[in-house]
């Protein structure tokens, strides 16, 4: 079995073992994976808030409501649910922005929210509240226990596929249908 040195910029796909957990049928974009642990954002679990409602919460007047009118805020994970994270293309020059790859960045600053409200932010965004985190080695153990599949980063999966289809589409990239998944690992 091939082992990746880092899961950064990959997606995790939840396996059936996680059906009765917070991570049921989730797809997670891995932001960081290093000697301190792993951080990711669930990209397909919708919050009950929309982006305009989130901006309204920050008392930001939405100048261009059509940009994100129906876009839901996502639940990035069960950790720190009050903290927001925005994945976006292109990167830009925001105050608290971390370049992730090519033209992708994660931003956590209010200036980005203001740009969203006034219509000057990038069109390709994923807004999450909370994140998913693992201690060093924990995620690899979960992968070995058959809790997750991994696939490389795919821009279309992140930004273009409807949230309720991301899990199925992610599995399809591996040539797998949900019906063919097993809860049993194929190794010891």
From Swiss-Prot:
PANTHER family: UNCHARACTERIZED PROTEIN YQGE (PTHR30327), UPF0301 PROTEIN YQGE (PTHR30327:SF1). Belongs to the UPF0301 (AlgH) family. InterPro entries: AlgH-like. GO terms for cellular component: cytosol. This is UPF0301 protein Tcr_1827. It comes from Hydrogenovibrio crunogenus (strain DSM 25203 / XCL-2). It holds the Pfam family DUF179.
